[in-house]
Amino acid sequence: MVPTEKLAQITERFEYIEARMAAGAAGEDIAALGREYAELKPVVAEIAAYSRARADLAEAEAMLDDPEMRALAEEEIPALKARIPEMEQALRLALLPKDAADARPAMIEIRPGTGGEEAALFAGDLLRMYQRYAEAQGWRFQIVSESLTELGGIKEVIAHVSGSGVFAKLKYESGVHRVQRVPVTESGGRIHTSAATVAVLPEAEAVDIDIPASDIRIDTMRASGAGGQHVNTTDSAVRITHIPTGLVVTSSEKSQHRNRDIAMQVLRARLYDLERQRADAERSAARKGQVGSGDRSERIRTYNFPQGRMTDHRINLTLYKLDQVMQGDLDEVIAALAADDQARLLAEVEG
């Protein structure tokens, strides 16, 4: 049973915000009110539906004492009793604490791991998988920095993804992705195992993370292209070191000004991610290492090409539709990961 007092408080808060926004909310932060309104609206809709169902059940049970209405009540009561637990579960999920970063755009960083050139080629496959997934979601996908190998693989790529609910879905992709297949570079037909690392960070604005100029060191260096050749003769590449944490971010596009912007954007995202991880650890050590924790060293998924199989090791989910997955069909696996995350959070909240 969900405490009715808590439901009443949420509804009252929603009605207050609605009234303040309708009145113009002079002197208040309209944007903050708008965000809270948008967050509470679906919760209040669940509360209203749940309250109506309970009222309908109480009314039907009262009708049992009326001989003329008894037959109708006996017909309605089983259906109402069956619906209420489902609605209560939906309401409990709606009441779960929200990740403040879920609505934010995201930065995706992909780097090859073990496996040499094959790992770099697989990193490129992952990039295209996310591009197709973003397109299917109606998101904007922009590559902000990319370094390629001579065979067209990826040494490193950073992309910016914006749209509705980007980080809420992509956050489950952080970790080590392993591939098992016969590489194009393999003449003997042997299956190799390679890996690539994906990091998904919520975008951070300057107002979220204050980086004093005294905390960073900016170095310029000569940019290199595929195979290590110099792509120009100017020192356009930028390396920014965050002195307090030791974080280092490098960008080597052709424009030094753009490289500074990219490096600062990535640095803000990484520092914001560190703050989030620290806060999560303080809130609950029990959630460390679970789905969505963002542990970059965790092997999360295996893509087995000979068997056409994708396995997500965090929830023991295996799908035999690898071709569709690599074409960006990630809905099923992401939905399963989100459901598992909700179940764990619900268990934690309810003890």
From Swiss-Prot:
Q: Which GO terms describe its cellular component?
A: cytoplasm
Give a GO molecular function annotation for the protein.
translation release factor activity, codon specific
Keyword annotations for this protein?
Answer: Cytoplasm, Methylation, Protein biosynthesis
The record describes its post-translational modification as:
Methylated by PrmC. Methylation increases the termination efficiency of RF1.
N5-methylglutamine: residues carrying this PTM: 229
SUPFAM superfamilies from the xrefs? Release factor
- InterPro entries named in the record: PCRF (IPR005139), Pep_chain_release_fac_I (IPR000352), Pep_chain_release_fac_I_sf (IPR045853), Prokaryotic/Mito_RF (IPR050057), RF-1 (IPR004373)
Q: Which domain of life is it from?
A: Bacteria
Q: List the disulfide bonds.
A: none
Q: Do you know which SMART domains this protein is assigned to?
A: PCRF (SM00937)
Q: Which residues form a coiled coil?
A: none
Query: Where the protein is mainly located, per its record?
Result: cytoplasm
Q: Give the signal peptide as a residue range, or say none if absent.
A: none
Gene3D superfamilies according to UniProt: 3.30.160.20, 3.30.70.1660, 6.10.140.1950
Q: Where in the cell is it found?
A: Cytoplasm
What is the stated purpose of this protein? Peptide chain release factor 1 directs the termination of translation in response to the peptide chain termination codons UAG and UAA.
Q: HAMAP family annotated for this entry?
A: Rel_fac_1
What family is this protein classified in? Belongs to the prokaryotic/mitochondrial release factor family.
This chain belongs to which protein, by name?
Peptide chain release factor 1
Q: Which organism is it from?
A: Dinoroseobacter shibae (strain DSM 16493 / NCIMB 14021 / DFL 12)
Name the encoding gene, please: prfA
